[in-house]
A protein has these predicted regions:
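ATP/Mg2+ or Mg2+-diphosphate-binding catalytic cores
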Residues: 2-7, 298-329
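Protein kinase glycine-rich loop
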Residues: 35-38
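A conserved alpha-helical element in kinase catalytic cores
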Residues: 59-111, 128-136
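Active-site activation/catalytic loop segments of kinase-like enzymes and analogous catalytic loops
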Residues: 246-279, 293-309
Length: 329
């Protein structure tokens, strides 16, 4: 059998489809069709059943999450579905009652963590942006935060990640200041990123000093991770669930769409929606903008590492960081 790493992308997907079929034997489903859906760090397959139901099977990337973090995701989703009317991506229990399958098949290296989700209707909110939708998004995030705050102490087995520094993924290579990447990062760019990292890490230290207020947050709530269907919002992709603070979730949401001409209007609608149900987090825009800058640095480093032609992205994002320091430095 040809080694997995020597296969074409199509060949690797054929192998992974065999893994999916093996995982699906743990569910009480009569499978009609399994087809590749997308790869966005994780690999997704669509599953159609004979009775007409649709599902998505997610194969987690080892680079992005751990089993314990996946367990935290399932814990919160299960609680949200049990306790609230918030519409979220719904994981499906296996025949043994658990959510997560750790599977392996010949020809695919290692073990793969997999979860089956019910199909989420509608289209990405990114395709339907409006002040009304962003008002709803603000309310939805406020409801998520209310629920997280009301949860009892987390079980000892639940260990979400924490966004307590700029580079918070434990195994993430930091490359922007290394010799191998000097052609992308001249000294002034390195100094710029260093300055932002220092300022952001000061804020992270201040936030996480308040241990009593830490709670589960979504960690990646933006207009690509929300579907709009018949006027209602469905929140998906809780993979980045973390122990943190509402301010961090707000910053993630507001970090998207900043080049749009209607960004200020969308931002105001989001703030109004959130504030209609819950006190707005943070004391100033400076805190939100610092968290947005921290996320920008993380993405600059990530894109430099994985994109064969990252120069334009790096330059554009560095310009944003310069504007941040000018306005809030």
């Amino acid at each position: 059998m040809k080694p997995y790493h020597e296969l074409t992308s199509r060949g690797q997907l054929r192998r992974l489809r065999r893994l999916v079929l093996e995982v699906l034997t743990s569910y009480d489903l009569v499978v009609k069709q399994v087809s590749f859906l997308t790869i966005e760090t994780n690999t997704m397959f669509r599953v159609d059943t004979e009775d007409g139901d649709k599902y998505v099977l997610r194969i987690y990337s080892d680079e992005e999450t751990t089993l314990r973090e996946n367990q935290a995701e399932m814990f919160w989703l299960d609680a949200i579905i049990r306790d609230t009317d918030i519409k979220v991506c719904e994981p499906v229990r296996r025949n043994d009652g658990s959510y997560i399958t750790v599977a392996s098949v010949d020809g695919v290296p290692g073990e793969r963590r997999c979860v089956l989700f019910r199909w989420v209707p509608g289209r990405a909110l990114a395709d339907n942006l409006s002040p009304r939708a962003y008002y709803q998004l603000g309310q939805t995030l406020a409801k998520l935060h209310d629920h997280a705050q009301q949860l009892n102490l987390l079980p000892e087995s639940i260990h979400p990640k924490q966004w307590d520094k700029v580079f918070y993924y434990p195994d993430e290579p930091i490359v922007y200041n290394t010799a191998h990447y000097h052609h992308y990062f001249p000294p002034e760019s390195i100094a710029l990123l260093d300055d932002v990292i220092y300022r952001a890490n000061v804020l992270f230290k201040q936030l996480y000093a308040d241990r009593a207020s830490k709670m589960l947050i979504h960690g990646d709530l933006h207009f690509w991770n929300v579907h709009l269907y018949r006027g209602e919002l469905y929140v998906i992709d809780f993979e980045d669930v973390m122990l943190g603070y509402p301010l961090q979730d707000v910053a993630v949401t507001l970090s998207y769409g900043r080049d749009r001409p209607d960004y200020d209007e969308l931002r105001a609608a989001f703030c109004e929606g959130y504030s209609s149900l819950r006190v707005w987090p943070g004391e100033s825009d400076s805190e939100i903008e610092t968290l947005i800058a921290a996320r920008t640095v993380m993405f600059i480093n990530y894109v430099a590492r994985i994109d064969p032609t990252p120069q334009q992205y790096i330059e554009q994002r560095c310009e944003r960081l310069q504007n941040y320091l000018r306005d809030f430095g």
